[in-house]
Structures are given as C-alpha cells and as structure tokens.
C-alpha cells in the first residue's frame, strides 16, 4: 500500500512510525497524522492514554496503562536489586542472524535490561553513538569470540516459519536456535557450549506493550530465584484479557521453553 492509496482512502487518522514519518509528512495536509512511541516500555503507558483520548476509549486506556505500568515497575524492582556483576552478558539478534546485534536504547535492549542482563554491545555503542537505539549493529565475528557471551537470544524467524500464537510447532524457533549454535567459529563460546541459545518471539520483545512480558520470560530464565514470584504465562493471560480474546497463551514464545530448562 502506497501513501497515495492512503490519501485516496481519506482515513480520519493515520498512525505511523517514527522511521516512516518523513515519507508521509505531506499527508498531514489532508489527514491528521499521529506518530507516538508505543515500543519502548517506559513510554507505553503514556502513549496508550493519549490514544485513549483520541479514540474516545479513555476508561479502557486507563485500565491498560495502569496494568502495564504496574507490571513494568514490578519487574524493574526485581532487576534493579540484582548486582551488576550477577547479570549475565548477552547478545541479541533481532531482524536477522549472523553477527548483527541489537544496541542499547532499542526496544529489544530494554527487554534485556529489564530481565537483568547486560548487553555486550554497550561496550562499543555508547549513548552518543549514531548506532545507539538501533536494532541491528554489525560486528566482527572475532569481537564476538573475544566477548564470549553467556547467552545469545534471537527473535529472528525464517519467513516461511511460524512461532508465537500462530503455532505450537517449535520447528521454526528450533531452526533459528540451531543456525546460531551451528556456527563453527562460535563453537567455543560459553553460550554455545552450555546450550544457552534461545529464541524469544518478537511479539514479546518488539514493543506494543509486551516488553515487560518478554522481560518476565527472560528474567525467569536468567534469574529463576529472583523472579520466582513472577509467572510470565499469567502476565500474558492478563494482557490478552484486554482484547477480550482467548486468555490461554498457547504457542511458541520461548524456545527452549522454561519447562525444558527445569
């Protein structure tokens, strides 16, 4: 769909991402353009309240914003109490495999930090870097080997595969995990040797109010004692209840699953 098609349809509002804002500024001449941040968890509650006002759903928006903020704060309190030296050093592939990893300030990184992990990319991408906040930063394989991550996570999925709510078949997630684990140059990494390569569904870490839930799954994996009272599946049920949909979270969200690691 092109922006010209949108203009022909003449919607009341156009909701767009920050990355695409430059492509559609001209639409603002004829359509009310809305561009808000609903991806990073610290902005989600405020963004939902604004949308609630715009679309005359203020009560629902207040309920969701309160739940989201409470969930976010609850998980953050746990991770804030974990000593920095006890937080494992990790890398996260988001949009593709190989040696491209998410940087600090991105929505994926915020899920990692909320789960009590240290992002190794922070060592080379600082807040004043043009790559800060990027979801894919290319590094050399030699650098990865030098850093020796304790865990490697990915939300990448072969376009021909499914995960998340779409299936209970783990083959797609397993394919991504195996692709990372089978990289011969990384065979001596602690993450590979210890079987600490995981797929987490992009739905849980890619924004839209779910980052705290993704962080709950990761936190439960990385710090089972500290996150003992957190039930990620229950948080997902609570989230789904806002959509009046089936509240039993069935699908492939984390692979290998938490149950497989017990």
Where are these regions (language model features)?
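N-terminal ligand-binding lobe of clamshell/alpha-beta domains
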Residues: 1-262
């Amino acid at each position: 769909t092109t922006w010209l098609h949108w203009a022909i349809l003449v919607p009341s509002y156009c909701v767009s991402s920050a990355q695409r804002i430059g492509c559609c500024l001209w639409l603002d001449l004829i359509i009310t353009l809305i561009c808000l941040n609903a991806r990073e968890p610290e902005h989600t509650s405020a963004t939902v309240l604004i949308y609630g006002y715009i679309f005359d759903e203020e009560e629902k928006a207040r309920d969701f914003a309160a739940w989201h903020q409470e969930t976010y704060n609850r998980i953050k309190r746990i991770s804030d109490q974990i000593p920095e030296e006890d937080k494992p050093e990790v890398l996260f592939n988001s949009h593709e495999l190989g040696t491209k990893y998410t940087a600090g300030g991105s929505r994926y990184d915020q899920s990692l930090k909320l789960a009590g992990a240290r992002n190794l990319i922070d060592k080379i991408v600082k807040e004043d870097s043009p790559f800060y906040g990027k979801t894919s930063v290319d590094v050399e394989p030699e650098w990865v080997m030098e850093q020796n991550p304790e865990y490697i996570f990915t939300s990448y999925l072969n376009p021909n595969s499914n995960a998340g709510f779409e299936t209970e078949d783990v083959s797609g997630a397993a394919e991504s995990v195996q692709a990372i684990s089978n990289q011969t140059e990384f065979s001596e990494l602690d993450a590979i040797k210890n079987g600490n390569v995981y797929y987490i569904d992009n739905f849980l870490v890619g924004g839209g109010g779910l980052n705290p839930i993704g962080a709950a799954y990761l936190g439960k994996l990385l710090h089972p004692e500290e996150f003992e009272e957190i039930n990620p599946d229950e948080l997902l049920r609570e989230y789904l209840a806002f959509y009046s949909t089936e509240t039993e979270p069935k699908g492939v969200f984390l692979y290998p699953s938490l149950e497989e690691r017990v």
